[in-house]
């Protein structure tokens, strides 16, 4: 992260730089371990705020016009409990890689049904599990209705705050986790900008890409030689 910040400072001081994308990940790690600890998280937010102010001032000294947009890609949900979905599936008379395939993430289980009968058995096995199968409409709303089912033919999403343990991600739960229903209040992301966003409404995380693309296209038009 320090290397990213140093590169951003160097770019901000370069008059030929027109767009900077700065990625930081320290806050994500802190929230996984210290979700709900306002003192710990507050100190990191203050540090980021200071970095943003310094970057903005530095860029303003070397450019006529400067705008700054800060956004996050997800929230963080406190741990409420764990669920062993894999154990429920392993009890079935099904062969992994022959009848079905599965990937156990921290908050969801993704399934591919290699034999038609496997779907009914797996669905029944998780009937009492705390969560729900994502509907096709939900997948479309969330932007994950991929026709090739690359990321799951069917996805079982846990209720907010629960974690699959053990999973393909971890053997022990973390105090905080993300990857739940984006409509849950702890899943909300954030966006702050010195420039109005009326020309590019941001409704979900995927819109951040469109926003950056739009700003880059605008810069290209503004700097295009006559």
Residue ranges and their predicted role:
Residues 29-32, 77-80, 85, 164-166, ...:
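Short catalytic/ligand-binding loop motif for oxyanion handling, primarily in non-cytosolic enzymes
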Residues 32-34, 74, 175-181:
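Histidine-centered active-site/metal-ligand motif
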Residues 6-20, 27-68, 213-215:
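A long, amphipathic alpha-helix that forms part
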Residues 98-219, 223:
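Active-site neighborhoods of enzymes that stabilize oxyanions during catalysis
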Residues 72-75, 160:
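Active-site metal-binding loops of divalent metal-dependent hydrolases
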Residues 35-39, 83-87, 171:
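Short secondary-structure boundary/capping segments
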Residues 19-23, 69, 155, 192:
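Structural motif
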Residues 65-66, 74-114:
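Acidic/histidine-rich catalytic neighborhood
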């Amino acid at each position: 992260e320090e290397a990213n910040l140093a590169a951003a400072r160097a770019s901000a001081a370069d008059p030929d730089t027109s767009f900077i994308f700065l990625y930081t990940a320290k806050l994500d790690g802190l929230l996984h371990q210290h979700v709900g600890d306002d003192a710990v998280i507050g100190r990191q937010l203050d540090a980021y705020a200071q970095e943003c102010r310094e970057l903005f001032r530095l860029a303003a000294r070397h450019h006529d016009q400067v705008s700054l947009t800060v956004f996050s890609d997800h929230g963080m949900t406190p741990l409420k409990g764990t669920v062993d979905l894999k154990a429920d599936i392993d009890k079935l008379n099904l062969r992994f890689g022959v009848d079905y395939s599965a990937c156990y993430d921290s908050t969801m289980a993704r399934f591919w049904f290699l034999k038609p009968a496997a779907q009914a058995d797996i669905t029944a096995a998780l009937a009492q599990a705390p969560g729900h199968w994502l509907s096709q409409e939900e997948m479309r709303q969330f932007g994950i209705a991929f026709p090739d089912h690359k990321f799951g033919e069917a996805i079982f999403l846990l209720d907010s705050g629960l974690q699959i343990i053990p999973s393909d991600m971890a053997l022990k739960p973390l105090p905080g986790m993300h990857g739940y229903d984006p409509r849950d209040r702890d899943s909300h992301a954030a966006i702050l900008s010195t420039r109005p966003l009326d020309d590019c409404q941001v409704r979900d995380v995927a819109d951040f890409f469109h926003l950056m693309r739009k700003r880059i296209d605008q810069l290209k038009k503004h700097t295009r030689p006559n």
